[in-house]
Each structure stands twice: as structure tokens, then as C-alpha cells.
Amino acid sequence: ENSFYRTFQWNQNVSFFKEENRTCIEIPDQNIYVYGLSYEHLEIHEALYDDWKKSDKRGFHVLMAHGGDEQHIPLDSRKLAEGGFDYIALGHRHQHQNLFKDWCLYPGALEPVDRNDLGEHGYIEGTYDQGTVRTRFVPFASRSYQNLYLTVKEGVTQYTLEEMLRNEIMKRGGKNIYHVI
């Protein structure tokens, strides 16, 4: 109840889901309907989005859903698709992933959060025109976590090993964070 999100004085153009139940926020001048719920517990094991459907109102219908594993609102992509939404914006996973091309995807984290967040990180840029959604992934991260494999032969000195490592890091980029294997 005393969360910063609940006590902060937000601008009038900022909306958020205040309760952990089905909510639809309407942007009337643009005929946009955004569906979602507040995530108020550390873990939620129920598949809360399975039976969600868009309303019959004419416009662009977006589902914002956080979850995707057994501890954090399990998601069934087939049931999400049956909801009839024009776009489904997913959150929780740090890796970019398309469940359905252009209209149901995880953007991932803008920057890698931990050493398991390998690969590119960025954001989703999208357009909606005459009933068609088009999206593209835009790389954004200033650095990445990478596995770095070194083959070390018997007799290699520590100095030589450090030089091999330094050279390989400089080839790949000095800003990145490496897990040496």
C-alpha cells in the first residue's frame, strides 16, 4: 500500500494497473485499449491470462502480460492467441523472444541483468497501420555478457595466458563482461 508507485504524484498521461485483477485502460482519442493487471506478489502460480479476451469495441487492443514460467504466471501461447488481441506485450524474460511474429513477443531487457543474459539486448519498435502490426528488434545494449572459450595447452605460463585473454577480450570488445571457460 505504501509503495512508491502508489504514493508518487504521476503526470496525467501516465497510467498503470493498480490491482491484481483484470483491468482495461482506454485511450479514447486514439481508440486504444490496454489490458493488464498489477503484479503484487513475489510469485503467482495461477495462469491468470488464459481466459482473457479483448472486448468487442472497435480499436486497437493490447494485452500487457508479465510472466511465463511456473512461478510467475504461467503463459500458454495458444490461449493467448485465442484472446483476439492485436498486440501482446510480454514481460519477465530477459531475452528477446517472438512467440508469434510481430504481435506477441518478449522484448527482453534493454541491458543484460546477469551472467545468464547472453545474446543481444534492445527494444521493440512497432507500427500499427490499417489493422497490421509490424515490429522489429532494435539492439540497444552498451555491453553484453559473453562466454569466452580459451584452449590452454600444458606448459602455458600465466603471463601467456593473461596475454591470450587480453587479446581475445580486445578483439570482442573491452566493454563486454566475459565468463572465461
Residue ranges: model-predicted function:
Residues 1-127:
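His/Asp/Glu-rich metal-coordinating catalytic cores
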Residues 63, 179-180:
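Structural beta-sheet core signal
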Residues 21-30, 107-179:
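Binuclear metal-dependent phosphoesterase catalytic core
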